[in-house]
C-alpha cells in the first residue's frame, strides 16, 4: 500500500495527505479483489499499510473516512461474493511478549487495528479470515507466559481471528513449541510455514509438523504458507531464509485439505506460474 515518510506525516497536521493515501489504498484493494475474482484467485493476503501511521491518530478523524469505509464495505462484499479467503500478516515489529511496554502497546493497537478493518468489511470474526503473527522472540517459559497474558488483552474479535506461525530460527518457536506452549494454553491455531520448518524442524518431519498444525484448526480449513529459497531458485548468495520471487515446485499437502498462501515476491506472476505447474503435475 501507499504510505509516506515519518517527516512528511508529521507535516500533515490536518491528515489530508494521509487520508488521501488511505483512500487510494482502499480503492486499490477493491481493484485487486475484483482481479482475483476474475482470475479465480481464492486465497489472498491483504497488505498491512492501508492506513499509514495509524497508531498516531483515530481513523475516524480522516477527512475521507466515510468514503474509505464505503470501499472497505465493498471489499467485504466482493470477498464474500467470490468466496475469497483473505488474511492479514502484520509487520514483524508486532511482539506481544516484548519486555518494552511501548512495543507491547503498539502491538496490541496494531492487531486490534487490523481486526477493525476486517470488521469494517463485515467479515465474520473467525479463523476463516485469520490475523497471522509470529511470537517473534526466542523460546522461553517467560516469553510464553507474556505472550499468553497479552493475548488476553486483545479485543474479543481480534482473539477470534489470531493465529500463530512457526519461526525460522532454531532457538525460536517451532510448530512443536507453538503446540505445547501456545495452542495448548490459549487455543490459537498454528499456521504451518513449510519454508520456515526447514530451518527449525524441532525433530519433526514436514508431514508430522503439517498434521500437528492442521489439528489446531478444528472445524476451520487450515491456512498454510509456502515459499522457496531465493538462493536456490535464483542461484544467488546471501540470506538462505530470503524468499524467492517465484515458487518453482509445488507443495506436498500430505493429503490434508488446506488453503495455501504463496509467499513470493512476484505476486500474481508467481501465482500464475505456480498454478500452471500444479495443474501440469496433476495431469501428468
Give names to the regions the model predicted.
Residues 90, 133-135, 164-166, 262:
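Short glycine-centered, acidic/aromatic-flanked micro-motifs in structured strand/loop junctions
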Residues 129-143, 234-240:
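Glycine-rich phosphate-binding "P-loop"
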Residues 50-52, 92-94, 135-140, 169:
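Short, internal active-site loops enriched in acidic
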Residues 1-85, 94-108, 112-123, 127, ...:
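Alpha/beta catalytic barrel-like cores
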Residues 170, 195-201:
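Short acidic, Gly/Ser-rich segments with clustered Asp/Glu that frequently serve as metal-coordination loops
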Amino acid at each position: 500500500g501507499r504510505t509516506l515518510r515519518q517527516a512528511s506525516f508529521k507535516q500533515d497536521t490536518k491528515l489530508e495527505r494521509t487520508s488521501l493515501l488511505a483512500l487510494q489504498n482502499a480503492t486499490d484493494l477493491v481493484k485487486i479483489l475484483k482481479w482475483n475474482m476474475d482470475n479465480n484467485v481464492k486465497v489472498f493476503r491483504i497488505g498491512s499499510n492501508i492506513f499509514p501511521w495509524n497508531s498516531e491518530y483515530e481513523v475516524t478523524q480522516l477527512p475521507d473516512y466515510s468514503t474509505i469505509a464505503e470501499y472497505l464495505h465493498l471489499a467485504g462484499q466482493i470477498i464474500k461474493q467470490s468466496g475469497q479467503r483473505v488474511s492479514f500478516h502484520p509487520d514483524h515489529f508486532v511482539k506481544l511478549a516484548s519486555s518494552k511496554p511501548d512495543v507491547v502497546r503498539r502491538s496490541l493497537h496494531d492487531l486490534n487495528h487490523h481486526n477493525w478493518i476486517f470488521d469494517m468489511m463485515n467479515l465474520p470474526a473467525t479463523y476463516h479470515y485469520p490475523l497471522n503473527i509470529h511470537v517473534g522472540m526466542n523460546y522461553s517459559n517467560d516469553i510464553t507466559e507474556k505472550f499468553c497474558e497479552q493475548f488476553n488483552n486483545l479485543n474479543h474479535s481480534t482473539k477470534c481471528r489470531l493465529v500463530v506461525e512457526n519461526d525460522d530460527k532454531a532457538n525460536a518457536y517451532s510448530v512443536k513449541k507453538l503446540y505445547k506452549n501456545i495452542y495448548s494454553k490459549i487455543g490459537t491455531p498454528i499456521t504451518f510455514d513449510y519454508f520456515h520448518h526447514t530451518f527449525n524442524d524441532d525433530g519433526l518431519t514436514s508431514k508430522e509438523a503439517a498434521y500437528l498444525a492442521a489439528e489446531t484448526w478444528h472445524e476451520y480449513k487450515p491456512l498454510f504458507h509456502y515459499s522457496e529459497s531465493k538462493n536456490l531458485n535464483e542461484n544467488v548468495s546471501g540470506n538462505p531464509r530470503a524468499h524467492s520471487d517465484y515458487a518453482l515446485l509445488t507443495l506436498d499437502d500430505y493429503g490434508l485439505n488446506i488453503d495455501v498462501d504463496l509467499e513470493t515476491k512476484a505476486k500474481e506472476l508467481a501465482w500464475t506460474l505456480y498454478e500452471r505447474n500444479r495443474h501440469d503435475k496433476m495431469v501428468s
